């Protein structure tokens, strides 16, 4: 989910670096430097990826929100990013986008750091994937060993959760929060 899960030393363990809303309530409404992008679901069901500053004008209408790292695409255009080792190197990546109509969410999980299986992606590669998938806005979430996709499997009266990808950390890394996709019945 959110970028990094800084260990707070408190009994609850990890703390989200970015904004985090659940069911219309702010769990965390401030963002650390560098974590200034937000994915949110509005009361009308529309979805957005916006800057922290833009989020301030819509937060009262927000049901769910999750902070993010770098913006990859803003209003249909690739965003320029800084040239540094993290952005130019191949790493496991987790990123997401929304379509122009603000109705469709696209989620991407890319394994990496596993020679012979997957090297990962660079920032530029993520932008190309988002453009090809039709993302109008997109942002980078936490990657590296935090890149994990879990699927709920129902078997009779029981449900189990299975890891669908091959995380580079083994076992899966503890994180502060995540993005849960739920079908309302």
Task: State each model region's role.
Residues 1-185:
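Gly/Ser/Thr/Pro-rich low-complexity, intrinsically disordered segments
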């Amino acid at each position: 989910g959110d970028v990094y899960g800084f260990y707070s030393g408190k009994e609850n363990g990890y703390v989200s670096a970015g904004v985090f809303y659940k069911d219309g309530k702010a769990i965390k409404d401030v963002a650390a430097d560098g974590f200034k992008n937000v994915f949110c679901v509005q009361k009308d069901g529309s979805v957005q990826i916006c800057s922290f500053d833009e989020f301030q004008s819509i937060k009262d209408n927000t049901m769910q929100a999750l902070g993010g790292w770098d913006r990859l695409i803003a209003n249909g255009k690739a965003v320029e990013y800084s040239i540094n080792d993290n952005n130019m190197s191949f790493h496991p990546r987790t990123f997401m986008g929304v379509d122009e109509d603000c109705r469709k969410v696209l989620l991407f999980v890319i394994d990496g750091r596993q020679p012979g299986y997957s090297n990962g992606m660079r920032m530029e590669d993520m932008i190309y994937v988002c453009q090809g998938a039709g993302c109008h806005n997109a942002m980078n979430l936490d990657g590296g060993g935090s890149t994990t996709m879990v699927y709920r499997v129902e078997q009779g009266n029981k449900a189990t959760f299975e890891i669908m990808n091959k995380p580079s950390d083994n076992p899966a890394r503890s994180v502060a929060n995540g993005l849960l996709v739920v079908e309302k019945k």
